[in-house]
């Protein structure tokens, strides 16, 4: 979870002999999109908010030391009069929280769930800078083109590359 990377950062700084110049920095970035929403017509309308969340820790040289990637896909239906049909009091779990219940494993060419693929990408970027993350080769659908990453990640990663770079750029020393 995002809390795990923040705790990891605090633990690393606590055990570090670095001064404030050499301590880890923590970055968080979230971006949302409504592009999957649909107007009501003959059928009910859908408002769908997709939010990508990335948390990183980076060292004094800008190298990623830890990364967590998650996403929330919140959906609500409404009728042609604009009346909400969805119970808005029901919590919306993140894709990491859903795990196997998200249901990607059965349709993925590599049999991996979304959370497993996000973790594989997060692991892959550890040891890289923001520029190196942005330089990861992708195809026209922004899916990994590098063989070792493509063997564990089949989802589009272009948005994640940008979100990781933004999290690195926003990283601040939080202290421990």
Which role does the model predict for each range below?
Residues 1-176:
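Active-site- and interface-proximal helix/loop "cap" or "latch" segments in soluble metabolic
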């Amino acid at each position: 979870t995002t809390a795990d990377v923040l705790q990891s950062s605090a633990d690393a700084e606590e055990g570090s002999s670095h001064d404030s110049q050499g301590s880890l920095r923590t970055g968080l970035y979230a971006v949302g999109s409504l592009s999957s929403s649909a107007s009501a017509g003959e059928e009910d309308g859908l408002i769908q908010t997709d939010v990508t969340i990335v948390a990183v820790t980076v060292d004094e040289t800008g190298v990623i030391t830890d990364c967590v990637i998650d996403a929330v896909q919140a959906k609500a239906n409404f009728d042609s009069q604009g009346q909400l049909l969805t119970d808005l009091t029901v919590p919306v779990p993140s894709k990491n929280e859903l795990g196997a219940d998200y249901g990607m494993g059965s349709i993925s060419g590599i049999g991996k769930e979304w959370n497993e693929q996000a973790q594989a990408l997060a692991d892959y970027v550890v040891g890289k800078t923001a520029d190196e993350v942005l330089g990861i080769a992708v195809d026209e659908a922004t899916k990994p083109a590098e063989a070792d990453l493509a063997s564990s990640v089949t989802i589009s990663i272009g948005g994640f590359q940008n979100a990781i770079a933004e999290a690195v750029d926003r990283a601040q020393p939080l202290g421990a």
